[in-house]
């Protein structure tokens, strides 16, 4: 099972993230590739995603509802680490509810760092 993301750099009133400058990301599609004959099936996990809705109209029949995924596969669907990393980075700033605290960035969070080799610190990676 592969995660497929819908992204945009033009989502209104959203803060860009990383070098790609994306400001909209969703894990809207799960891709299953049959190991025996290579057929690919795309399952929609976020039917409300406007990009997925557009793809469905442009390529009718390509995307199937998540309910059609076999239960044996559906039980293996996990929350993607990449989305979690993006959300954690955004939440570090946007968890603040008081406008004054937010404006002054008085309660800015950071992802914990782990000491690495040769005095280098690396951000802690998410795990299941």
What would you call each of these model-derived segments?
Residues 10, 20-77:
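Soluble extramembrane regions of membrane proteins in the secretory/endomembrane system
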Residues 1-32, 104-128:
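Exposed beta-strand-loop-beta-strand "reactive/processing" segments of non-cytosolic proteins
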Residues 51-128:
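Accessory, solvent-exposed terminal regions and/or long lumenal/extracellular loops of proteins
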